[in-house]
Amino acid sequence: MWKLKIADAGGSQWLRSVNNHIGRQIWDFDPALGSPEELAQIEDARDNFARHRFDKKHSADLLMRFQLTKENPQSDLLPKVNIGKIEDITEDAVTNTLRRAINFHSTTQAHDGHWPGDYGGPLFLMPGLVITLSITGALNAVLSKEHKKEMCRYLYNHQNEDGGWGLHIEGPSTMFGSVLNYVTLRLLGEDVNGGDGEIERARKWILDHGGATAITSWGKMWLSVLGVFEWCGNNPLPPEMWLFPYYLPVHPGRMWCHCRMVYLPMSYLYGKRFVGPITPTVLSLRKELFTVPYHEIDWNEARSLCAKEDLYYPHPVVQDILWATLHKVVEPVLLNWPGKKLREKALCSAIEHIHYEDENTRYICIGPVNKVLNMLCCWVEDPNSEAFKLHIPRLYDYLWIAEDGMKMQGYNGSQLWDTAFSVQAIVATKLVEEFSSTISKAHEFMKNSQVLEDYPGDLSYWYRHISKGAWPFSTADHGWPISDCTAEGLKVVLKLSQFPAELVGAPLSAKLVYNAVNVILSLQNIDGGFATYELTRSYSWMELLNPAETFGDIVIDYPYVECTSAALQSLVLFKKLHPEHRKEEVELCIKKAAAFIEKIQESDGSWYGSWAVCFTYGTWFGVLGLVAAGRNYKNSPSIRKACDFLLSKQLASGGWGESYLSCQNKVYTNIPGGRSHVVNTGWAMLALIGAGQAERDPVPLHRAAKFLIESQLENGDFPQQEIMGVFNKNCMISYAAYRNIFPIWALGEYRCKVLNASRGQMKT
């Protein structure tokens, strides 16, 4: 049976940590574990998912729930609340619902204080891992038979009915997803006609849609290193860009960190034209994936091919001209003497930056794509290197298993982020005394996860921002500082500092609080907005150079309503508790941030959310940011428009239900069938409550509360519905804890700020 291990080094001599691995979550298979009843429960969950996989594509993260709820059994479970009419919503009904919800949520808290969970969703991550392990000869050493079995289960479970795979688990089939996952299954040992016909159906989809020459640029790169595509069929990724002077707007150091940290190792592999061992499987794949014989493929034509199913961001003409010039003129010079000397210098610079990233994330790396690319680069440089060995145990940090199988996550988890939201949700209920143990553990995790030092060396040389005092998205070992994670972390420690230490634990020291404020103040852009990891370093026209056909807005770090609002809210709370510390800077930052939020509001009153689905999420942040800055419904046209927008989207069930299509199409779209979603409903309620909706007409809030109460499951959990996270406009990602966090938070605010105040106004 699989077992989730928390804060565990697994006895590896190759693991490094700044805080004794707090927050680390890995799955380990032990054949001796599991009673017959437990094993049957897991198999039932797997069978149930497989039966309904085309209708419900998101797992409910049941393996983790089975384990942790057994390790942390609930106290006496209160009976489920049933509501007939909204008049039946009493304070007792809401409080019982909250107690049931927090009780359950507390049972899924890990012993180190964080909430583990599924952060999967994208379907292009695991192929890079498997291709890298195959090339380096480490596949069987790293992945056990059980790992491979669960990975295959996952891929078959998320194969679409037409035979292909999407960019993410809910998406339509794409060439990128279909080719890479087909290759992954073959490398994992599946036969060319294996999987009860699924392999054959996948191959048919690929060939019917033009074959692998039409895969996206990232796919072309992965196939090239594997030996199933020629490098001359790729658009250039010259590592010489890293030698440009930094004052040029196109310098990679000015790009969004995720973008540059992916293209850094890609440029190293491209610059070396590295190709892995040509195995029988590789030779077979050359025959399986293309519509013409491999030796007849026009690789120059293939450079610019992309299947229409994948084309979210078509290349502008200027980009095609640039790639053609680099390919036909510049690259031939750099591959031969004397230009080869410059190429060697560029490769040395690239690998130096790769090692810096590896060492300062304890070999976790910023994300799963550059993690496996960096690992491959270390092996290419020296197959016997210590760097390559240090990479291997950190692969497990990215693997997660649920009833749908084993997946590769979009980060090494969302530990800090989910914990920060969980604490704020429970605090909002005013039931902290009842759940002080849960809050105390979470508080310790928050304190243990703060980044305590800046990156070593000259930060400008490594293109890094300050990090001392920040909070990361996942763990301190990961360590990349993020604006909204720092803000949410700061909000938590400030809120908990107002409770007795014997109830929630000792507060964070003022010095460490000030360090966090320093990071937040340092991240505000001239326009008042906050981006993610760093300041916005270049211009939006740089997006013309975005070579990734699948993703939008990836080249620079844009400012976002979510990051700006979180920073603003944290500083308003800080100012209240520490009114004299950097008073003028804090006040100016708040003022500029509020103005930025107002400026980027959509004409219909919404805000576009870039990190979750979508307009309900963005509008929650937009409204709460303005309210924190002193705006209200009466004095702010922005808040009035936002409330009108949200109320116009409320469904007959009383809830809100927004489809991921809102993100990619930038138009509000309901979930098919007009279904409400507990997470969207939570966000909308929080925004409306914050904007004073209860004072004007509480009925929409009562209807929404009724929907949430009725949605609660018998055990206090809430149902897993459609996927709710997103990045780069077009790719969805899972936040398994959101279904617990936001109903708790919304009902908590409802109980304390709406119910009693509006009881006399309630209507049918």
UniProtKB/Swiss-Prot annotation:
Entry membrane topology: Single-pass membrane protein
Record-linked PROSITE patterns: TERPENE_SYNTHASES
A GO-annotated cellular component: lipid droplet
Active site: 484
Tissue expression per record: Expressed in all leaf tissues.
Major localisation: membrane
Entry annotated with the keyword Transmembrane: yes
Disulfide bonds: none
One Gene Ontology molecular-function label: cycloartenol synthase activity
Compartments where found: Membrane
Main function: Oxidosqualene cyclase which catalyzes the conversion of oxidosqualene to cycloartenol.
Protein name according to UniProt: Cycloartenol synthase
Source organism of this protein record: Kalanchoe daigremontiana (Devil's backbone)
Taxon lineage: Eukaryota, Viridiplantae, Streptophyta, Embryophyta, Tracheophyta
